[in-house]
Structure formats: C-alpha cells, structure tokens
C-alpha cells in the first residue's frame, strides 16, 4: 500500500473546515482529480457514504467510500468499498493560529501491470495532488476570514 501524509495550518474555525469536508459534495471543488461525487447517503454512525469518479494518471476510476469513523470536529475516516482500495484519515485540531488538519492516506495503486517505475511516478503525482487539494481547501476556508495579528 502506498502512503501519503500531509499536515496544513488553516486560519479558519475548525468547525467550518470540518463541516465543509464532512460533505462529500464539496470534494470536487478543492480536489481536481475527484471528477464527480454522487449518491451521497447519511451513514448511521455519522458522516456520509458516497460514490465517486477519480482521475489517476489520466485514467478514470469509479468507486464508493463509506464512513469508518466519525467524531465531529476531531476525526473523519473513510475507506473504499469498491474501486481504488483506500483509507483516508482526516484529523482536526484547534491551535492558536486557527486549526491544523492532518491527512493520512493509504491506497493501492490500481494498475498492477504498469511496472515499478511507473508506480513510483503515480505515487509522486498522487502526493502532489494531495498537497494541492489541502492548499485549495486552505484557500477556500480562509476566504472572508478576518486576519488578526
């Protein structure tokens, strides 16, 4: 399994960031590779289950994710039920400057026949994609938030 690990500081209320990220409909807005989110349903344990179409290395993959753990304003974990085998763990923490978001992803590159070199390139692209997504979230959340010294 490939692993990604990113942390970002967002100068916005934690509750605002969590609420935005808890709605899968918002993912394509900040995550260019997430082409579509559909059939979103409430999970009985909190959070949402949803289907998606994702672009990895120019190939489109359809899948579905379900909530594995949902602790409001603290942690949200999803795992795939079909499609790309993955687990996303989002951890939220209040800090003096706003909030810290930690993203940890484990996933299986879905193309076993491409060879090790191509797999390394795809993993680097996905790492870059995750970083861009977090910065897009930061930009989106910091809009209309007063900056205080």
Q: Positions of the model-derived regions?
A:
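Hydrophobic ligand-binding cavity/cleft-lining segments
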Residues: 1-45, 136-139, 147-149
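Hydrophobic/aromatic beta-strand elements that line small-molecule binding cavities or substrate pockets
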Residues: 6-8, 63-69, 87-94, 105
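Beta-strand elements of well-folded, non-transmembrane domains
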Residues: 12, 56-58, 69, 84, ...
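A short, structured loop/turn motif at beta-sheet edges
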Residues: 14-15, 42-45, 69-73, 91-100
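Short beta-strand segments that buttress and anchor functional surface loops
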Residues: 50-55, 75-82
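Beta-strand/loop substructures that line and gate deep hydrophobic ligand-binding cavities in soluble
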Residues: 80-132, 148
């Amino acid at each position: 399994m490939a692993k990604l690990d990113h942390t970002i500081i967002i100068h916005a209320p934690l509750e605002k960031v969590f609420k935005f990220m808890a709605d899968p409909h918002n993912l394509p807005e900040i995550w260019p590779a997430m082409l579509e989110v559909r059939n979103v349903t409430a999970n009985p344990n909190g959070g949402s289950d949803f289907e998606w179409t994702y672009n990895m290395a120019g190939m489109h993959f359809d899948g579905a994710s379900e909530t594995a753990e949902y602790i409001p304003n603290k942690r949200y974990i999803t795992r795939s039920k079909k499609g790309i085998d993955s687990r996303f763990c989002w951890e939220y923490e209040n800090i003096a400057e706003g909030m810290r978001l930690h993203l940890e992803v484990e996933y299986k590159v879905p193309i076993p026949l491409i060879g090790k070199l191509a797999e390394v390139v795809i993993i680097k692209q996905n790492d870059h994609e995750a970083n861009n997504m977090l910065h897009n979230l930061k930009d989106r959340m910091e809009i209309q938030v007063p900056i205080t010294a």
